[in-house]
Amino acid sequence: MAYSYTEKKRIRKSFAKRAAVLNVPFLLATQIESFASFLQADTPPPSRLNHGLQAAFTSIFPISSHSGNARLEFVQYMLGEPAFDVKECQQRGLTFASPLRARVRLVILDRDAPKETVKEVKEQEVYMGEIPLMTTTGSFVINGTERVIVSQLHRSPGVFFEHDRGKTHSSGKLLFSARIIPYRGSWLDFEFDPKDALYFRVDRRRKMPATILLRAIGMGPEEILATFHDFDAFHLRGNEAAFELVPDRLRGDVAKFDITDGAGNVIVARDKRITAKHIRELDQAGVKMISVPDEFLLGRIIARNIVDAETGEIVARANDEITEDLLDKLRDAGVKDLETLYVNDLDRGAYISQTLRIDETADQWAARVAIYRMMRPGEPPTEDAVEALFQGLFYSEERYDLSSVGRMKFNRRAYPEKIEDKAPSWLKRFYETVGPRGEEGPATLSNEDILAVIGVLVELRNGRGEIDDIDHLGNRRVRSVGELAENQFRAGLVRVERAVKERLSQAESDNLMPHDLINAKPISAAIKEFFGSSQLSQFMDQTNPLSEITHKRRVSALGPGGLTRERAGFEVRDVHPTHYGRVCPIETPEGPNIGLINSLAVYAQTNRHGFLETPYRKVVDSKVTDQIDFLSAIEEGQYVIAQANAEIDADGMLEGDLVSCRHKGEFALSTADQVQYMDVAPGQIVSVAASLIPFLEHDDANRALMGANMQRQAVPCLRPEKPLVGTGIERTVAVDSGTAVQAMRGGIVDYVDANRIVVRVNDDETLAGEVGVDIYNMIKYTRSNQNTNINQRPVVKVGDHIGKGDVIADGASTDLGELALGQNMLVAFMPWNGYNFEDSILISERVVAEDRFTSIHIEELTVVARDTKLGPEEITRDIASLGEAQLSRLDESGIVYIGAEVDAGDVLVGKVTPKGETQLTPEEKLLRAIFGEKASDVKDTSLRVSSGMNGTVIDVQVFTREGIERDKRAQSIIDDMLRSFKTDLADQMRIVERDAFARIRRLIVGQKANGGPKKLLKGTAITGEYLDSLEFYHWFDIRMADEELAAQLEAIREGLEKTRKDFDQAFEIKKKKLTQGDELPPGVQKMVKVYLAVKRRLQPGDKMAGRHGNKGVVSRIVPIEDMPHMADGTPVDIVLNPLGVPSRMNIGQILETHLGWASKALGNKIGTMLRANAAAAEVRELLEHIYNDNGRPEDMGSLKDDEVIELASNLSKGVPFATPVFDGAKEEEIEAMFELAGLQPGGQVTLYDGRTGDAFDRQVTVGYKHVLKLHHLVDDKMHARSTGPYSLVTQQPLGGKAQFGGQRFGEMEVWALEAYGAAYTLQEMLTVKSDDVTGRTKVYESIVKGEHKIDAGMPESFNVLVKEIRSLAIDIDLDTY
C-alpha cells in the first residue's frame, strides 16, 4: 500500500474489520458538478447538452414578433474571464463573476413574399449580464462574502395518488385523490367527494365535476362511460328479457330468482348468495344466457343512446336509469338489444356515471366555457380567449413543462408495465389502445394521460392498487445549485422576451441591431436577487472545515417551492426507510427545523433525474462481487440487500443459513442465495459529521445528533491537535474542505517560508509550454465569516519529494492533513466539590497556561469618508480633541500602524466631519480670530475600538474612489502587494531558467560547435568549464554544428522569451488592477478596513463539548497543584461529572476515554524507546504489533528505516486510532491495546486529592478524550452596563449586548426580593435603576455631590399603563394624598 507524503508521517491504526471496498467520494462533488453542468464552460458551444444555461436559452429563443415578420434566434453563449480573482473580490467587496455574452441572430422576413423569404440577417454578440462563478471549494463570493447555495429537497414532478386518511368526513370514509404536479405550470387535482362523485380542480381553485374536463377534451357521455365501465348485455324478447351471463360478475350477489342450466336444473336457488362453487358449476354447464324477470333490469344504467330506428328519436340517453316506464317505452320502440353498465357496491363503483349526472354542461364548448369561468371569473368568454386558455393550461410547451423527471415518474405510475389479471376489462382495453410507454415522452399532458390518471384513481376507489408515500425518497428529488440557477436565469429571460417581442416590430422599420433589442438588466436582477437574497443562498458557516463541508452537503425541504416550517407535519420530518444511505438519520437541527434540514450521507450522490442514490455491491449466487451499482430509492425497493457486516468467507461467499437483509423498507432474514446486493460500508447511512464520532454505535441517537451538530461549532485552536481516537475519515474531510493545501503536481520543494511554498515540478508532469513551477501562497491570519482565524502552515521542508495530491500545508483545525477540531485532554470522571454539578466542567490551570484552547478571532472594523452637504469628511491625523497618547498609534495619514495593541475606546482611524454653522459667542469669535478657522467647524467621528474588545492590528486596507488622490498609507499597501507579486514571478522565472539551462547543458556538453563567444573555434567540442565561463544568456550565441541541436536551442530561447513576456504582462495587469480606483458605494470617497486579532483564552463561562453530545460550561479553573493526580504525580486536565453519562446513554465517550489512554500510553512507550536510541528494527517490531495484531493491517514493510523513526517520533505523543462507525474497536481489542501498553485492565486508577494528598475512596475512570471549545464564548455574551440607551415609550433600559442594555429584573426576581423583605432594594430596582426619569437624574446629581440619597418617584411604565387604560375610553386619575 502506497502512503502519501503526509500519511506516512503519522499512520492512523484502524480497527476496521474489512478492507474499504469504495473510497469516500469527493465530498463537494454534488455542488461542483451541478454548477459545472449548468455553465458547461469547458464544452465547445456546438457540443453543449441541452441543460443548464443552454436549456434556458433554447426554451425562450427564437422570439418572434407579433406579426411574425421578424425573429431573434439564439446561436451560442460565451463566458468571459472574471475581472478579479476570488481573493481580490473578497477584499474589495465584489462578486466573483464572469461576463456572459450570447451570439444572437436577427432574421427579418420579406412580408410581401408569398412564402417565407429571408430579407435580412444580422448577427451580433450581446452582453447578457454577469453569472457568479463557483470557487474551487464549492462556494460563491457575493459582494465580498462567501455564500453557499443549499440544495433543496422538493416533491418530484409527476402524478401522486393519496387519500385523506379518513380525516375529512365524519364517517371516516377514505377520500382518494390524485395530483399531477408539473415542473412548471398549473397543478391538476382529481378528488372524490363523500358521495363518490369525482371532481377536478386546477391550481387549487374551485372544484368542478371531472366529466367537465373529459367533455372539454372532446369526449361525449357514451365515450366517457365506455372508457371507465364494462357493459352487461340484455336481449328483450316480448315480455321477458335474456341476460348474457358472465359468471364472474355474479360472485357475491344474492340471486333474486332461480338460476337454472339448459336442462332446467336449479344451480342457484332464489335468495341464496352466489359463491365461487356456483360460478364453477355455471361454467361447466356452459350457461351463456339466462332469462331474467323485469325487476332484474330496473335500476340499471343505460350505456349508450338508444334511437328509435323508425322516427330517429332518442328513446333513452346514455347514463339514464331504467325504470318501468322506460322499459315499456323501449319495448314499444322495438328495441331488441340493450347494454347497461356493470356496477356493484364492492369493487365496481358507478363513480363516473354519478359524476356525469351532476355535470350540467351539454357539449365540449360549454365545458370549456365552464373551465374558463372558473379560471377567470368575471371575464367575458370569447371564443379565442376560451380556446387559448384551455390549450395553454396543459398542452402548451411555453406554459406547461412536466420535465423529463416528471414524465418518467408519470409513465411509471400511470402506465404500469404489467397489468394485473384482476383488473377490469375496460382498463385492459385502455392500456391495449394506448400501447406500452417507456420513460420518455412529451413534456406536456395528452388526453390519454388525463384518462390514465382517472383510471388509476377509479381503481384505487374500487379497492385495487396502492396509494403513494409522499415521504418516500423516490417521490422527492434534489434541486442543486445548477438547477436553481437555471430556473432563475430562465425567469430573467422570460422578462427579456416580453420586451423583445414589443421591440421586434420596430426592428425592420428602424434598422435596429440585436443589442438594441436586448436589455440585460432583468437577467442581472434575477441572478443578483437569487444569489444575494434567496432563502437557499446562505451566509457560509465557516467556523471550521467541517462546518463548511456540512453546509455545502446540506439538503433543505424549505425555500421557494418547498415546505414551510409551520405547515410541515411530523411525517415529513421523520426518518424514512428510504433515507438509508442517502440522507443521514442523525444530523439535523434541534429547533423548529428538525427533520426539514438534512445532511447527505457520506456515499450519497444524485442521479441525472435528481434522485438520491447510494452504492451497493452486487451479489451473484451468494458470491459478493466487486461490481458497485448506485441505486435510487425507486430501484432499491425490488432488491434484497444484505448489510455491510454480513459474514463472508475467504472466497467472498456469504456465510450462514440466514442473512440479515432489507427488502421493501423492512428488515428480514433471507437465505444467502436470495441476496442480490450488499452495503459497501457500515458507515454508509450517516453523514460526514456523524461519521466523525468514534463509537457512534454506543451512543443514544439524541446525543449523537447533538454531537454531530456541536462539532460544527468547534472553534479552531491556536495549535490544532489531531484526535487520538478518530474514525479514519478525518483526512478526507480536511483535504476535501480545501482548508489544507494539496499539491497540484508532484515535484521537489524548492523554497519554504511561512508565507509561501515553491515547488519545482517533475518533468513528466509538465506539459510543453507550461511553467514547471508551482507557487502556493499561504493564507495568513484571514478572517472567516464567523470571525474565526484562517491560517495555513507549511508541513514540508526544502528538498522534500512530494506527489500530486499530497498535503503540503495545514489550515485551520487541521494537523498533518487530518481534521483536528479540539485538543486531547486527560479526563477524570468524578465529582469535585460540586464544581461539576449540572454538566459543569472543571479545568486545570495548566490547560490555560499552555494555550491549549486559546483561539484567535479576527474582527473587521470599517470606516468610510463620505461627501456630506457641508463638505467632504476627511481621514486625517490632525484632530484637535485627541491627545498625544491616542495619536501615537496613528501614522501621518491618520490610520493605525500594523502591530499596534489597542483597547476599547482607542482610535484606529482619525476622521473629521464638517459641522453646521452655529451662532458664535463673542469669546468664540475672538478665539477663532486668533487660532484660525479649522478647529471649530469639524467634529471628531473617528473609528474607535468598540467596548469589550481589545487586540492587535494585523492588517489595514485602504480603498479610494477613482479620481481621488491616494494617501501615503494606501500607496505603501499597493507597493507591498506589487513587491510580493514580483517576488513570486521572479521565483518562477528563476526556476524556469535554471531548468532550461540545465537542459541546455545536458544537450550540448560534448557536442561540436561552429563557433561562439570568447572566440570559440569551429569544430571544438563544448565543455562544462567553457559554459561556466560564460554568462547564461550568452549560451544562446553558441553556433552548433548539428542543425537539430541548434533548432532545440532556439526553441528553448523562444520559450524563455515568451515566459518572460507573459510574466511582464501578468505584472502589468496586476499593477493596473491595484492602481485603478476602487468601486465604492455612491457618495463614499474613501474606505478603510482595520483587522484586529483578538486572543481568547479559555475562561469560566466558555462552552465546551465532547463528540458524543456531552456539553457543559467551564465552572472553574483550578491551580494545577489542586487538581486530582495519579500515583506518579500526573495531574488530570479536566474533571467531568460521572452522573452525566448513564441518563444520557452516550457510552461512546467512556470507550473513547479508555482507547485514548491506551493510545497515549503506547505513545509514551515508543517515546521511551526513541530516547533510549533503540534500533529501527526494534521500533518496527513494536509498530508491527500495534498496527497488525488486529484490525485493518498496515504495510510497515514499505517504509524505510528513517521513515519508521520519523513515524515513531510523531507517534510518541500518542498512537492515533481509527474506530470507524459501526465497525469500530471491540472490548477485547481495547483490552489488547491496554495489555500492549502495559496498563492495568479496567481503565480505572486510584487518584489523589491535590489539596490534601489523600487517595479518593474509589478508583476513577481516567483517560484521554478529544474535547472541543465551542463558538459560544463568554466574552461574546457577557457585558456590563453603567449608563446607556433607554426605550422611548417605557423609558426602561434596552436589553441585549448589541444595544448595550441592562439585565432584566423580571417578575420572578421581584418575588425573590419580596420573599427576603428587601423593600428598599426592590424600590431602587423598580424606580431609579429602571424607568423613574426624574429619580434617575436626581441620583446622578447626588452622586456628583458625593451624597448617597435616593428620592424615588413614579415609574414611567405606570404612566404608560394609565395612558393605555385611557385609550380604552376609561377615565383614570391618580389621587395623591
From Swiss-Prot:
InterPro entries: DNA-dir_RNA_pol_bsu_ext_1_sf, DNA-dir_RNA_pol_bsu_external_1, DNA-dir_RNA_pol_su2, DNA-dir_RNAP_su2_dom, DNA-dir_RNAP_su2_hyb_sf, RNA_pol_bsu_bac, RNA_pol_bsu_CS, RNA_pol_bsu_protrusion. One of its GO terms (biological process) is DNA-templated transcription. It catalyses: RNA(n) + a ribonucleoside 5'-triphosphate = RNA(n+1) + diphosphate. Pfam families: RNA_pol_Rpb2_1, RNA_pol_Rpb2_2, RNA_pol_Rpb2_3, RNA_pol_Rpb2_45, RNA_pol_Rpb2_6, RNA_pol_Rpb2_7. Its EC number is 2.7.7.6. The keyword Transmembrane does not apply. One of its GO terms (molecular function) is DNA binding. GO terms for cellular component: DNA-directed RNA polymerase complex. The RNAP catalytic core consists of 2 alpha, 1 beta, 1 beta' and 1 omega subunit. When a sigma factor is associated with the core the holoenzyme is formed, which can initiate transcription. NCBIfam families: PRK00405.1, rpoB. Belongs to the RNA polymerase beta chain family. This is DNA-directed RNA polymerase subunit beta. It comes from Aromatoleum aromaticum (strain DSM 19018 / LMG 30748 / EbN1).
